[in-house]
Swiss-Prot record:
The gene is MED17. It comes from the Eukaryota. This is Mediator of RNA polymerase II transcription subunit 17. One of its GO terms (biological process) is regulation of transcription by RNA polymerase II. Residues 246-271 are annotated as: Disordered. InterPro entries: Mediator_Med17 (IPR019313). The keyword Signal does not apply. Keywords: Nucleus, Transcription, Transcription regulation. Pfam families: Med17. Component of the Mediator complex, a coactivator involved in the regulated transcription of nearly all RNA polymerase II-dependent genes. Mediator functions as a bridge to convey information from gene-specific regulatory proteins to the basal RNA polymerase II transcription machinery. The Mediator complex, having a compact conformation in its free form, is recruited to promoters by direct interactions with regulatory proteins and serves for the assembly of a functional preinitiation complex with RNA polymerase II and the general transcription factors. Its main location: nucleus. It is found in: Nucleus. One of its GO terms (cellular component) is mediator complex.
Length: 653
């Protein structure tokens, strides 16, 4: 070979045996790298002597500095600082002069000394801590932003959720011109319905027809209505009812929407439901107030027209008093329904006292109302609102439809009568009909075999009742009857009816078995089952009803007597049977509405020869008393047995 090859050999590391396992395998310690060796060597260096010397030097310097500081001049530090500043300023001035002289200025390169390991670790720790703090601040910012966004979404959800629920029942409009910021969404609730009004009616628009919807800080829908700005209609009888509403609750709905919102979601949901219900109730009150104002405005215009059923006796702001028939006076007023209506309420009460002068305490008012025949004021307050609703709202709807078949719409049929006049006539009729009903109930309650039925007339100025009586069945077999119709059936009635009809303040009675006047004057009986109709007044009504019932009983007994062939005749309220020639016995009815035991009593009277043979009038007349229909029928059968024809007929049965 031309050249020599040099081979360098390192010493083989001596590996000391660490352990020998049971199977003979040898385990050696792991190799240590260069850095670890250097670190272990550095750790072996003892710097304790250097630290001790350094500590001694520091202690000496501290002692010396403490001595010098006591003896130093107080301005020495400031002088040193000024000297250093002067040196630095001199260097800067020299550098500026050199640059201005265009001399070459060279900056010698400097190398940064290699940092120590502890400095690197310190810088890394500071950088990591700074970044960690920045991440924490960023996380907190994101959390706050997410929480604020969630609260905003919840507020929007609450607002629009409540608005959607209200939109189911109310007309919600959006005014885009008003939506200038997030707190005001520009929504309004329209409570008017101008499309249904008659253009010629002339209703004044209400200030409460449009209500602005706000968005409060809690995210809930808020409507602001001024206090004492809405009213409710009050109706009553002067001298019998107070002007205030006795059914009015002490708690009023707040016109603002400030509520404390609970924190939990369940309570929040419950409070939202309650809040929407309260808002709905408030809108209902405002809507009712608009309706009441329009109704009162219509009544004021109707009051200046001539009416048959009323006379205006007092007219003030939000108050009207009128006199109607049957000696009754009523008032209609607008009563404040806000949160503090005490002042206006006292003013209205004072006005009522001054206008009527007949205000009395309400104790025992229900009994007195019933006694005088006055109906429930709440029902007629509803009726007044109902006829106005039909006139104002129903009239516009019916223009495109056929006319309604309801008989209650009396105002369309009577073009000469206004709504107020029709209402007063209806109320007068109800007072009068209640008094008629009191008399009918008094008669029916005293006579056990009478019954009273009330018929609906579907007319506010017409009332109808029926007094009916069911008689016992006949004991005469059908085949042995002498009064039969062509089809073979007996003409016997089992029920008798008396119909009483009241129209306005006129009473008409229609009944069976009423003999006409001509037949009575001729002393002859008329058709037993003829139906006659006549009129009477309230004072004579009980007597007329009792006479009619007694006449029907006599008709029934007469028909039963003729069935067996007995000679019998009828003279108004008496039934006469001929015992023998020249002798007659009569069953006479006597009516007395004031008799609490039965109102109808019966007498047995002997006539002609019997009367002449007996001494004293008392022997020819005998009081039978108040008899039931079964007992009357038995008395009739006993009288028939006394008669020759009737006795023979009964023996052949």
């Amino acid at each position: 070979m031309d050249s020599d090859m040099e081979i360098s050999l390192d010493r083989l590391p001596i590996k000391r045996l660490e352990s020998i396992e049971e199977n003979g395998a040898e385990r050696f310690p792991s190799d240590v790298d260069y850095d670890d060796k250097r670190v272990s060597l550095i750790r072996r260096i003892d710097f304790a002597w250097a630290l001790e010397e350094e500590d001694e030097l520091k202690k000496k310097k501290q002692k010396k500095s403490s001595k010098d500081s006591v003896e130093q001049w107080k301005w020495k530090g400031m002088v040193e600082n000024l000297q250093l500043a002067h040196q630095e300023l001199t260097v800067i001035i020299d550098l500026i002069d050199t640059v201005q002289a265009n001399d070459a200025v060279t900056v010698a390169g400097m190398t940064r000394p290699k940092p120590m390991p502890n400095e690197i670790l310190s810088d890394l720790a500071v950088s990591t801590a700074t970044k960690l703090q920045g991440y924490r601040n960023l996380g907190n910012y994101f959390k706050q932003s997410a929480k604020a966004l969630e609260q905003k979404i919840n507020r929007e959800a609450r607002f629009y959720g409540a608005l959607i629920r209200l939109q189911r029942n109310w007309k919600v409009k959006r005014q885009r011109m008003l939506a200038s910021n997030a707190s005001n969404e520009g929504f309004t609730i329209d409570l008017s319905d101008s499309s249904l009004y008659d253009p010629t009616s002339g209703f004044r628009p209400s200030t409460l027809s449009t209500i602005r919807v706000d968005h409060d800080s809690a995210g809930m829908l808020a409507i602001n209505v001024p206090q004492d700005s809405w009213y409710s209609l009050r109706f009553g009888y002067v001298g019998l009812n107070p002007i205030g509403n006795s059914n009015e609750s002490d708690e009023h709905i707040d016109s603002t929407t400030g509520h404390d919102i609970p924190g939990t979601s369940e309570k929040l949901s419950a409070s939202d439901d309650k809040y929407v219900k309260e808002t709905h109730s408030l809108l209902r009150e405002v809507h009712k107030s608009i309706f009441a104002e329009q109704l009162f405005d219509m009544l004021n215009r109707e009051a200046f027209n001539e009416g048959v059923g009323f006379n205006i006796s007092g007219l003030r702001e939000n108050f009207m008093e009128m006199s109607i028939g049957q000696g009754a006076s009523l008032f209609v007023s607008l009563h404040p329904s806000g949160k503090n209506p005490s002042i206006k309420k006292s003013e209205s009460a004072t006005l009522l006292i001054e206008s009527s002068g007949r205000v009395e305490p309400a104790e025992g008012g229900d009994y007195r109302l019933k006694k005088l025949g006055f109906p429930n004021r709440t029902s007629y307050e509803i009726y007044l609102q109902q006829i106005f609703h039909e006139h104002a709202f129903g009239k516009a709807k019916d223009q495109l439809k056929s006319k309604s078949i309801r008989a209650s719409n009396q105002t369309e049929k009577d073009s000469n009568s206004g709504l107020l006049d029709h209402f007063c006539l209806s109320l007068t009729h109800r007072i009068f009909s209640n008094r008629v009903l009191v008399h009918l109930e008094s008669v029916v309650c005293k006579v056990p075999y009478l019954h009273l039925i009330s018929h609906p007339t579907w007319n506010s100025r017409t009332s109808s009742w029926t007094v009916f009586m069911t008689v016992p069945p006949s004991i005469i077999p059908q085949g042995r009857s002498e009064t039969q119709s062509p089809d073979g059936k007996r003409n016997l009635k089992t029920q008798f009816r008396t119909k009483v009809v009241v129209k306005d303040d006129c009473i008409s009675v229609e009944a069976e078995c009423t003999p006409n006047v001509v037949g009575l004057l001729k002393s002859s009986s008329c058709n037993l089952f003829s139906i006659n109709k006549y009129e009477c007044d309230v004072a004579d009504l009980p007597v007329m009803i009792l006479q009619q019932v007694a006449s029907q009983i006599v008709c029934w007994l007469l028909e039963e007597a003729r069935t067996v062939g007995t000679k019998a005749s009828r003279e108004f309220l008496s039934l006469s049977l001929e015992i023998v020639e020249g002798e007659r016995v009569s069953l006479v009815a006597h009516v007395n509405p004031e008799d609490a035991k039965g109102c109808i009593s019966w007498w047995l009277v002997m006539e002609n020869g019997c009367t002449e043979e007996r001494e004293g009038v008392s022997e020819s007349r005998k009081l039978l008393g108040h008899l039931s229909l079964d007992v009357l029928y038995s008395v009739l059968m006993d009288l028939i047995n006394l008669c020759g024809t009737g006795r023979n007929a009964l023996e052949r049965l």
